[in-house]
Amino acid sequence: MLPPAHLARLTTLVATLLAGAGGAWADVGGTVSLQTDARERGMSYSANRPSAQLGLAWDGDAGWYAGAQLAHARFSQHRGAAVLLYGGRVIELTPGLDGEAGLVAHAYENVSSYDYQEVYVGLLGERWNLRAYLSPDYYGIGQRSLYAEFNLRWPLMKGVAAVGHVGLLHGWGGQVSPYADSRNATRMDVRLGASWQLGAGSDLQLAWTAAGRGGPYTWMDATRRRTVVLGLTVAF
C-alpha cells in the first residue's frame, strides 16, 4: 500500500480545493474502464499490456469538482497501484466557453520516488478542450515540465463520434538523464480514433496512438511508441 504520509499529502491537495465548496450538494459517479494498453500522454504505463481502471468523480455547486482514479502500473522492476487525485473549479467565461483551474497529484505504490504533482488551467468548449499542466518535478526526475494538450470529440452520427488528441511535453532545468534524447527537450503525442456509445453510460473507443522521442525521460520510455488501443468504459 501507499505510505500513509503520501496518501495524507495527496488528500490534502484535493481537500483544500473542496473547502471552498462548503456543504454544497454534489453529484458523485464512477467509471470502470478496460483497455488493451493503458497509456498516459502517449506512453504506456502498463508495459504494453491490458489494464483496468476505476474512477470516482464529484461534481459540486459553483463549478467545484474533484475525483480519483485507481489503476495498475507496471515498471521495469516493480508493479503496483497507480493513484491519481484531482480537484478544481470550472467557471463560465462566455456562453459556450468555460475556464477551469485545478491541481492533480500522481502517486505510485512501491516506487514513491515517481510521485509528482501538477497545477493546470484550461478552456472548455462544447466539443473540445485545451489544457496546460505545470509540474515542478516531473515523475521525480528533478526537471520541471509543461504539458499542453488539445482534445476534440466530433459527432459523426447518432452514437458515433470521431476523437482526436494532440499533446506537447516540454522539460527543462535540473539534471538531464543520460538516457534522454539530448537533441530535443520536447515530445509530441497524438491519438486519432472513433467512439461508439453502447447504451446509457457505456462507451467503446478504438484509437491509434503515437508518441515521439525527446522530452523528460521517464520509466515509460522503453515502451512501444505506436499502437492501436481498444477501450471500454462503463459509468455507474
Model-assigned labels for residue ranges:
Residues 1-29:
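Cleavable N-terminal export/targeting peptides
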Residues 25-74, 160, 167-168:
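Short glycine/proline- and aromatic-enriched beta-strand/turn motifs that initiate or cap beta-hairpins
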Residues 28-30, 62-66, 95-101, 127-132, ...:
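Repeated loop/turn-to-beta-strand initiation elements of outer-membrane beta-barrel proteins
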Residues 31-33, 55-59, 88-90, 122-124, ...:
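Transmembrane beta-barrel domains of outer membrane proteins
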Residues 34-40, 70-74, 91, 105-109, ...:
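Transmembrane beta-strands of outer-membrane beta-barrel pores
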Residues 48-52, 79-83, 113-119, 124, ...:
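Residues that define the transmembrane beta-barrel architecture of outer-membrane proteins
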Residues 116-182:
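Detector for outer-membrane/organellar transmembrane beta-barrel domains
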Residues 126, 192-198, 202, 222-236:
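Outer-membrane beta-barrel "beta-signal"
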